[in-house]
UniProtKB/Swiss-Prot annotation:
Assembly: Homodimer.
Protein name: Putative 8-amino-7-oxononanoate synthase
Gene Ontology biological process terms from the UniProt entry: biotin biosynthetic process
Principal EC category: transferase
Natural source organism: Neisseria gonorrhoeae (strain NCCP11945)
Record gene name: bioF
Keywords assigned by UniProt, alphabetized: Biotin biosynthesis, Pyridoxal phosphate, Transferase
Length: 380
C-alpha cells in the first residue's frame, strides 16, 4: 500500500487531493458541516430538481401504481420497457430527426459512441477542451486523433486539409457549451467545415446547453437552427432536466450501429423505468420553461460582468461563470472564504482544467433571486 499512500501524499502536497463531501440538500441551498450555503456549484440550471409541484404532479398521475424501480437487465436482453421507446420517439420528434437513443449517463454515451462508430482507419479531431468522457471515448477508439486548439477553426481546417483521403471517415468532436469556461462553440463554422470534406461527421455534446438555450430548450443547435446539420447531437438528462441518463439524436443507420457495437449500451443494465418515466415527464414540458430560461440569462449576464470587472478574464457566454484565480492555493483559499460567507463554491484544479488556470466554477440556477446573486457578487 505504500505506493498508493505516496500518491495521495503527493496530491495533498500539490493541493489536488479530493474527497467526497457530506451534504444535505434543501432546494437551492446546501448544508455542509452545519453551514447552510447558497449552492453556486449545481448543474440544476432550470432549478427543477427541487420543484415540489412538478414532483407531485408526476407522482399523482400513477395513483400508486408506479413504473418498475429496476430494469434488471440490458435493453438488448430483457431490460427494455415501452417507456424507453416512448421517450426516444418523443426526443426524436421534438428535434425533428429520424431517431434517438437513450444511455445511462452522459459519460456512458461519450465513452461508447466513438469506439462504436470508428475503425483503426478513422480519424478523430477534437476540441482541446472537450470533456474527460469524450477523451476516454477517443482513447478507446484506437484510431488516429488530433486535438485542435480550443475553438480555433483555422487550426481545425488545417488538420482536415492535411488528412484528406488518408482515412475512411473523420469525426469532428466538440461541446456546444464548454463545462469549465462557459464559452460556446461556433456550430455554424463547424457545419461549414464538415460539408467541405468528404466522409466527415460532426459530433456535438450539448450536456450544458439542453434545457437552457433555444426557443424550446433544445440547446445551442436549436438556437442556431442547425439541428438537422449535426450528425450526432448528444445531451444529458441529469443537469437542467433534473433527471438521469443521456440521449443521442441521429439518423436510423447510426442508431442501429450504436445498438450493435456500443459496449456501454450493450453490457449495462438499463436505467429503471421509473427514472425514464420522470425524464419523459420533464422533457415533455421543456418548452414551458421559457420564464426560467429568461431569468437565468439575466442573472448570468450580471454575474459575468461582475467577475470580469474583478479578473479581466471572462470567456463565458452562459450561466457557467469561471472565476479564474490561477494557482491551487489561492483558489482553495477563496473557495473556503466564500463558503464562510454562505456560498457553496467549489475549487476546480488541474487536471480538470489546464495548469495555472485553477478557478471557482460559478454555476447559476433559475431558482436563485436577483438579490441573492447581487449579494454574492459583493463578496467577490
Amino acid at each position: 500500500m505504500k505506493v498508493f499512500r505516496q500518491q495521495l501524499e503527493q496530491l495533498g502536497a500539490q493541493n489536488q487531493y479530493r474527497s467526497i463531501p457530506d451534504l444535505i440538500h434543501q432546494g437551492r441551498y446546501i448544508t455542509r458541516e452545519n453551514r447552510k450555503m447558497l449552492n453556486m456549484s449545481s448543474n440544476d440550471y432550470l432549478g427543477l430538481a427541487s420543484d415540489e409541484n412538478l414532483r407531485r404532479s408526476f407522482l399523482q398521475q400513477y395513483g400508486g401504481n408506479f413504473p418498475s424501480f429496476t430494469s434488471s437487465s440490458s435493453r438488448l436482453l430483457t431490460g427494455n420497457f415501452p417507456i424507453y421507446t416512448d421517450l426516444e420517439e418523443l426526443v426524436a420528434q421534438r428535434f425533428q430527426r429520424e431517431s434517438a437513443l437513450l444511455f445511462n449517463s452522459g459519460y456512458h454515451a461519450n465513452l461508447g459512441i466513438l469506439p462504436a462508430l470508428t475503425t483503426t482507419k478513422s480519424l478523430i479531431l477534437a476540441d482541446k477542451f472537450v470533456h474527460a468522457s469524450m477523451i476516454d471515448g477517443i482513447r478507446l477508439s484506437r484510431c488516429a486523433f488530433f486535438r485542435y486548439r480550443h475553438n480555433d477553426y483555422e487550426h481545425l481546417k488545417n488538420l482536415l486539409e492535411k488528412n484528406v483521403g488518408k482515412f475512411d471517415r473523420t469525426f469532428i468532436v466538440t461541446e456546444s457549451v464548454f463545462s469549465m469556461d462557459g464559452d460556446v462553440a461556433d456550430l455554424k463554422q463547424l457545419v461549414q467545415l464538415k460539408k467541405q470534406f468528404p466522409n466527415t461527421y460532426l459530433y456535438v455534446d450539448e450536456a450544458h446547453a439542453i434545457g437552457v438555450y433555444g426557443q424550446n430548450g433544445l440547446g445551442i443547435a436549436e438556437r442556431d437552427n442547425l439541428i438537422a446539420e449535426i450528425d450526432l447531437l448528444v445531451g444529458t438528462f441529469g443537469k437542467a432536466l433534473a433527471s438521469v441518463g443521456a440521449y443521442a439524436v441521429c439518423n436510423q443507420v447510426l442508431k442501429e450501429c450504436l445498438i450493435n457495437q456500443m459496449r456501454p449500451l450493450i453490457f449495462s443494465t438499463a436505467l429503471p423505468p421509473f427514472n425514464v418515466a420522470w425524464t419523459y415527464f420533464i422533457f415533455e414540458r421543456l418548452p414551458q420553461f421559457s420564464k426560467e430560461r429568461s431569468h437565468l440569462e439575466q442573472l448570468s449576464a450580471f454575474l459575468r460582468r461582475e467577475v470580469a470587472h474583478r479578473t479581466q478574464i471572462m470567456p463565458s457566454e452562459t450561466c457557467i461563470v469561471p472565476y479564474i484565480l490561477g494557482g491551487n492555493e489561492a483558489t482553495l483559499a477563496k473557495a473556503e472564504y466564500l463558503q464562510g460567507q454562505g456560498y457553496y463554491c467549489l475549487p476546480i484544479r488541474p487536471p480538470t482544467v489546464p495548469k495555472n488556470t485553477s478557478r471557482i466554477r460559478l454555476s447559476l440556477t433559475a431558482d436563485m433571486t436577483t438579490d441573492e446573486v447581487r449579494q454574492f457578487a459583493a463578496c467577490l
